[in-house]
């Protein structure tokens, strides 16, 4: 991120660095994302029901999945997850600087206002997920497969089979199921992540003794993850439930109301800890990788010029 200046890398190079960094973050943290999705899709026990919830907490959920389904199940959905990050990560992160510069004007000098950073994050998050929604849908569907009883036939044999099966059985439009809450979620979370990283990094660099190094990137990444989860959890829960149980809800508002009535307001923060564990670590890994990837590309460009 460049807090106030113009990007010193071309758009294709920025896109490539962003997509690569997002994919690294995805591979490293998808077990936590799988745990988050399972917790969000788990319905609260009915009043008087003695059945205890199957999944309890981040580590408990990860352990249960690994024990009952094998370690590989923790990476279920990694293929569409990487598809998603190549498209969505590359677009939302790669376009952030150009869009931010567009909003402030080419002749702007100084620190970019926080409002412009937020607006740029909302814009690139919304545009990016409109393209990448099918990959998000398939990822959630594959992660939700573990809800099926032991021995029950699986709907999909893999990512490509999931795409074709959904199109064949539900139509092409089904690939954009949950687009409304997904656009809202990703626009909000993207703005929270990128704007907060930008702002926190800019603030830290003004403190004597701090430089643009790994420590600054880690602190900024943790701040980005925290703000993203606090702001985006409710719409994230709605998105996961709509994509995981597509026939149970008529739309975004219907899903919100039914969730509120059946599970109460705290249901919108179900999985908060694993969500923060995932997004906090994802942001640290992604931004560290992004900063190093950009540094490497700059050095490579400089060596070619010399």
Curated annotation (Swiss-Prot):
Q: In which tissues is it expressed?
A: Widely expressed.
Q: Under what conditions is it induced?
A: By cold stress, high light and chloramphenicol.
Q: Which GO terms describe its molecular function?
A: amino acid transmembrane transporter activity; oxidative phosphorylation uncoupler activity
Q: Output the InterPro entries linked to this UniProt entry.
A: Mit_carrier, Mito_Metabolite_Transporter, Mitochondrial_sb/sol_carrier, Mt_carrier_dom_sf
**Which Gene3D superfamilies does the UniProt entry name for this protein?**
Mitochondrial carrier domain
Extent of the Solcar repeats = 9-102, 112-203, 212-296
- Domain of life from the UniProt record: Eukaryota
Q: Where in the cell is it found?
A: Mitochondrion inner membrane
Outcome of mutating residue 83 to L: Reduces proton transport activity 3-fold
Q: Where are the transmembrane segments?
A: 15-35, 71-91, 118-138, 177-197, 218-238, 269-289
Name a GO CC annotation attached to this entry: cytosol
Mutation: residue 155 to L; reported impact is: Slightly reduces proton transport activity
What SUPFAM superfamilies does the record tag this protein with? Mitochondrial carrier (SSF103506)
**Which keywords describe this protein according to UniProt?**
Membrane, Mitochondrion, Mitochondrion inner membrane, Repeat, Stress response, Transmembrane, Transmembrane helix, Transport
What is the recorded function of this protein according to its Swiss-Prot or TrEMBL entry?
PUMPS are mitochondrial transporter proteins that create proton leaks across the inner mitochondrial membrane, thus uncoupling oxidative phosphorylation. This leads to a decrease in the efficiency of oxidative phosphorylation and an increase in heat production. Is involved in protecting plant cells against oxidative stress damage and maintaining the redox balance of the mitochondrial electron transport chain to facilitate photosynthetic metabolism. May play a regulatory role during photorespiration.
What does the sequence similarity comment in the record state about its family? Belongs to the mitochondrial carrier (TC 2.A.29) family.
Additional facts recorded: Over-expression of Arabidopsis UCP1 in tobacco plants increases tolerance to oxidative stress caused by exogenous hydrogen peroxide, or by drought and salt.
Q: Can you say what this protein is called?
A: Mitochondrial uncoupling protein 1
């Amino acid at each position: 991120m460049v807090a106030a200046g113009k990007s010193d890398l071309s758009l294709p190079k920025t896109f490539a660095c962003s997509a690569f960094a997002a994919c690294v973050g995805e591979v490293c943290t998808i077990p936590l994302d799988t745990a988050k999705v399972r917790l969000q899709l788990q319905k609260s026990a009915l009043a008087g029901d003695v059945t205890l919830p199957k999944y309890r907490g981040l580590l408990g959920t990860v352990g249960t999945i690994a024990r009952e389904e094998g370690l590989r199940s923790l990476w279920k959905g990694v293929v569409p997850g990487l598809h998603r990050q190549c498209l969505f990560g590359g677009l939302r992160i790669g376009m952030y600087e150009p869009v931010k510069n567009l909003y402030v004007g080419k002749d702007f000098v100084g620190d970019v206002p926080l409002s412009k950073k937020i607006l740029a994050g909302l814009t690139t998050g919304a545009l990016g997920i409109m393209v990448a929604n099918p990959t998000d849908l398939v990822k959630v569907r594959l992660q939700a497969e573990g809800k099926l009883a032991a021995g029950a036939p699986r709907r999909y044999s893999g990512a490509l089979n999931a795409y074709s099966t959904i199109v064949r059985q539900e139509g092409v439009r089904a690939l954009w199921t949950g687009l409304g809450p997904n656009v809202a979620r990703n626009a909000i979370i993207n703005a929270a992540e990128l704007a907060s990283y930008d702002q926190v990094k800019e603030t830290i660099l003004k403190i004597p003794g701090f430089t643009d190094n790994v420590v600054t990137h880690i602190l900024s990444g943790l701040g980005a993850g925290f703000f993203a989860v606090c702001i985006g959890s409710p719409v994230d829960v709605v998105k996961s439930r709509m994509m995981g149980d597509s026939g149970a809800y008529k739309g975004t508002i219907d899903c919100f109301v039914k969730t509120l009535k059946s599970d109460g307001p705290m249901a919108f923060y179900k999985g908060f800890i694993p969500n923060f564990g995932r997004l906090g670590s994802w942001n640290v890994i992604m931004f560290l990788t992004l900063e190093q990837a950009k540094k490497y590309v700059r050095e490579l460009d400089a060596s070619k010029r010399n």
